[in-house]
């Protein structure tokens, strides 16, 4: 049996690039100067150009402010940082294991504080209403940084724009929900910052989930140091919360004791999520850069899948590496970046494919399907993956089906008890076999 982690593939000395701020990620994006409305306009235009990265320079309801969509995709991030997908996964895993402290800077060195709204009015920001099925305008790419009783948390939470200074935010049962419940039990509100458009290292760290109280900003700092060769710089807002200094927006707010209706909302699977009573957030100040660019992520599209799925890849790869060498993990588009993955391995002995399937499903408990392929197959290419299935997989002996497994809340087909069945497909060649009849010249 293979044991132990494989060595990281990235080369530390050659992976530092000058691109740091969110707006730097927009190099090469489509520029749209025609008037675009926050009400369905961004989604409609994005669909018309096949969801390429795009910057909207003329938002009808937000004079002088801009927005961007389709910025974060795995291939695009790898191209920008000049790394392979496998290296990106290894760097994410390294940062999780090696958190570091960010650097606090003075307010005069923080671009995010270049402008402050005279009176808070969120309706004047480029907050989009993408799908007609949504309740209304939503922040979907903003992260919440909260601190309570010495614990800091940074995470994504969608926010429905209720009125000029209030949003209603969906808190799933994770760390921020636990923090909020604890504060409410004490009759206390929580001071927070809502950050939109930080650099990619912050966005990736905010999308990670940990079983313990690990400060996501320290993971972002490690990523920033590895990819940029510089510390992640934070600035302290007047409410005491520290935020990335080069973010596009930093908004001072508090989680109140009140709840209100949140939803419906088109979630990552493209299905419509329910209406629930969720916490109300009151906004007290809005700061932003000059000509700020609002990150207006489109739910169920490429950025949503990237931010949901990419941070799961390191945990899956680590789990698989415990039993067999693993070179890549790709959370598939058809699985909404969450429910299905393709895993590339190098089998060493008979049965390694099945071992890899079980390890991958353990590494990401929400996953419903995993396909294991050889390292000569591009995990991100569905045509090549299907080719591997058709030429290397025998359904009656290379398939694992598990019943009565804990399912994902994002899967509407799961049972009322939350249980589902899961499937693993082994499309690898047996070790030692003559590979020539199975190799493609295409």
Protein language model features and the residues they cover:
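Extended, highly charged
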Residues: 10-264, 270-280, 284-442
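Low-complexity, intrinsically disordered or signal/transmembrane-proximal segments
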Residues: 2-5, 12-13
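Accessible peptide chain termini
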Residues: 1-2, 20
């Amino acid at each position: 049996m293979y044991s132990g982690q494989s060595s990281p593939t990235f080369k530390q000395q050659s992976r530092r690039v000058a691109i740091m701020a969110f707006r730097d990620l927009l190099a090469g994006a489509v520029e749209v100067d025609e008037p675009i409305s926050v009400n369905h306009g961004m989604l409609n235009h994005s669909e018309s150009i096949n969801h390429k990265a795009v910057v909207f320079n003329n938002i009808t309801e937000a004079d002088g402010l801009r927005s961007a969509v389709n910025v974060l995709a795995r291939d695009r991030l790898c191209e920008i940082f000049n790394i392979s997908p496998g290296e990106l996964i290894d760097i994410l895993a390294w940062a999780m294991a090696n958190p570091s402290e960010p650097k606090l800077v003075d307010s005069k060195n923080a671009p995010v504080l270049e402008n402050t709204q005279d009176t808070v009015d969120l309706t004047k920001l480029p907050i989009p209403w993408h799908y007609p099925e949504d309740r209304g305008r939503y922040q979907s790419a903003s992260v919440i940084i909260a601190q309570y009783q010495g614990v800091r948390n940074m995470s994504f939470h969608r926010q429905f724009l209720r009125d000029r200074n209030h949003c209603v935010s969906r808190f799933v049962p994770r760390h921020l929900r636990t923090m909020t419940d604890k504060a409410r039990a004490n009759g206390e509100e929580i001071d927070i910052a809502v950050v939109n458009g930080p650099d990619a290292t912050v966005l990736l760290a905010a999308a990670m989930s940990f079983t313990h109280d690990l400060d996501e900003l320290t993971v972002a700092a490690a990523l920033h140091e590895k990819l940029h060769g510089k510390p992640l710089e934070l600035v302290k807002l007047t409410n005491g919360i520290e935020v990335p200094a080069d973010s596009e927006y930093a908004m001072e707010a508090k989680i109140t004791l009140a709840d209100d209706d949140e939803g419906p909302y088109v979630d990552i699977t493209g299905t419509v999520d329910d209406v629930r009573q969720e916490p109300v957030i009151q906004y007290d100040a809005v700061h932003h850069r000059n000509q700020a660019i609002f990150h207006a992520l489109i739910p169920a599209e490429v950025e949503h899948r990237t931010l949901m799925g990419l941070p799961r890849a390191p945990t899956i790869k680590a789990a698989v590496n415990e039993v067999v060498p693993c070179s890549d993990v790709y959370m598939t588009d058809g699985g909404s970046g969450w429910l299905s993955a393709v895993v590339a391995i190098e089998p060493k002995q008979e049965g390694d494919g099945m071992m890899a399937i079980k390890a991958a499903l353990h590494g990401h408990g929400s996953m419903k399907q995993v396909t294991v392929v050889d390292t000569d197959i591009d995990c991100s290419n569905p045509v090549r993956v299907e080719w591997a299935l058709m030429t290397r997989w025998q359904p009656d002996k290379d398939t694992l089906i598990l019943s009565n497994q804990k399912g994902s809340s994002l899967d509407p087909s799961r049972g009322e008890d939350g249980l589902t069945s899961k499937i693993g497909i082994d499309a690898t060649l047996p070790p030692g076999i003559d590979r020539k009849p199975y190799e493609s010249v295409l």
